[in-house]
Every structure is written in structure tokens, then in C-alpha cells.
């Protein structure tokens, strides 16, 4: 939480390798060095013993909370962002990443709800061959989708949107000239921003 107000009953945790500068009310979950590259460390949230017991609302640091999170948190099982701005029927089935062909996807892990023990199987699958998966996929979203772990739960369109791509399918190939803003949404993703 960089700025803003929140109810005192909410506990915040920060999963990072560096606790310097964290607000004293934020609990630190140290990132364990397992020789994972960048975003792949996020998958460790599904590793047994990393998170305290209970239900979790995970937020990347590059999101803006702009409304109430009640509806977001009320998801009862593993839930990720559905990228409504990505026309899944038109996405390439032969996307080449670093010489390997993978399927594109329409999910995003910038916001997730899950129970601490709900996704151990995802971690265990990844840990069977982490080096190969980190080469095969550009990030964990592709891994989760292409390895068959995409959730069946998503928030409805308009609750979470992309500042760069907006909310509508046609925005994927023609992003708005100006950064997109949807006042009624709960969360804005700052994905695809580059220097914005």
C-alpha cells in the first residue's frame, strides 16, 4: 500500500526480497532464493508453507485500487483476471517466444484470489521442471494457461481493466491514444505500459 486509506481490520503482506521501507503495519513474507527469474517467483505463493493459512487476495505492485474490493474478495475459489481486451478467438495459436511455439492466452495474474492450500498442485507441476518452463513461457500466466491450470472463475467485465488496453476486445489491436480510465472499476492494471 503506497498511499490511501484502508480499514484497520485488513492485514497487508508484502512478498519481496527487500523489506526496507515497508510500512510497519505490513507483514513481510521474505522471498526465498530458489534461482527463479523475475515474475516466476510469484509461483512460490502456491508452494506449501509460504503463506499463512486462509484466503488470499493477491495484488501486483503495479495495480491501482480505485474502488471497493468487496466483490473482488468474495470469490470463493481460485480466481484470476480475465483479459476481456484480448480477443481469444483471434489470438495466435502459434505465438513464438524465444524460438518456441506457445499458445497465447487471455488470463492475467496481477490480481488473484485463492486459498493458501488450493494451488499446491500448480507449484508441484512447475517444480518438476522449472528451467524448461521458464524457457518455454514468457511468464507465469502462459504457464498457468497452457499447462491446464487456468481457473474457471473470473471477475465480470468492467471490475478490472487495463490502463493501456482498456476493456474491450477491439482495444488489443488498437489501444486507445490516451491511457484508459474506467471510473466504475475496482482495479486498474498498469500492464503493457512501457514508459507510462
Q: For the regions a protein language model found, what residue spans apply to each?
A:
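Short, solvent-exposed loop/turn segments at secondary-structure junctions
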Residues: 18-21, 33-36, 63-65, 84-87, ...
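A short, conserved beta-to-alpha structural element at the edge of catalytic cores
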Residues: 79-103, 108, 115-117
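Short, well-ordered coil/turn elements that cap or connect secondary structure elements
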Residues: 7, 23-25, 73-75, 149, ...
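Short, hydrophobic beta-strand segments that form beta-sheet elements in well-ordered domains
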Residues: 8-17, 55-60, 78-80, 151-156, ...
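A short secondary-structure junction signal
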Residues: 68-70, 90-94, 122-127
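N-terminal anchoring/stem segment of glycosyltransferases
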Residues: 1-38, 50-53, 192-196
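Catalytic core and acceptor-binding pocket of nucleotide-sugar-dependent glycosyltransferases
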Residues: 106-196
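GT-A fold catalytic core of metal-dependent nucleotide-sugar glycosyltransferases
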Residues: 20, 28-30, 41-90, 114
Amino acid at each position: 500500500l503506497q498511499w490511501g486509506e484502508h480499514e484497520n481490520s485488513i492485514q497487508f503482506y508484502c512478498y519481496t526480497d527487500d523489506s526496507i521501507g515497508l510500512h510497519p503495519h505490513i507483514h513481510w513474507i521474505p522471498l526465498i532464493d530458489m534461482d527463479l527469474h523475475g515474475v516466476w517467483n510469484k509461483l512460490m505463493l502456491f508452494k506449501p508453507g509460504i503463506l499463512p493459512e486462509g484466503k488470499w487476495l493477491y495484488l501486483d505492485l503495479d495495480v491501482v485500487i480505485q474502488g471497493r474490493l468487496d466483490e473482488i474478495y468474495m470469490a470463493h475459489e481460485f480466481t484470476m483476471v480475465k483479459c476481456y481486451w484480448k480477443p481469444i478467438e483471434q489470438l495466435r495459436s502459434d505465438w513464438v517466444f524465444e524460438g518456441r511455439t506457445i499458445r497465447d492466452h487471455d488470463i492475467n495474474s496481477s490480481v488473484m484470489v485463492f486459498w493458501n492450500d488450493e494451488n499446491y498442485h500448480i507449484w508441484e507441476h512447475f517444480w518438476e521442471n522449472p528451467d524448461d518452463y521458464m524457457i518455454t513461457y514468457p511468464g507465469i500466466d502462459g504457464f498457468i494457461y497452457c499447462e491446464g491450470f487456468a481457473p474457471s472463475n473470473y471477475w465480470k467485465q468492467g471490475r478490472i481493466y487495463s490502463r493501456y488496453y482498456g476493456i474491450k476486445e477491439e482495444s488489443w489491436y488498437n489501444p486507445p491514444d490516451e491511457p484508459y480510465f474506467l471510473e466504475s472499476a475496482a482495479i486498474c492494471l498498469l500492464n503493457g505500459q512501457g514508459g507510462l
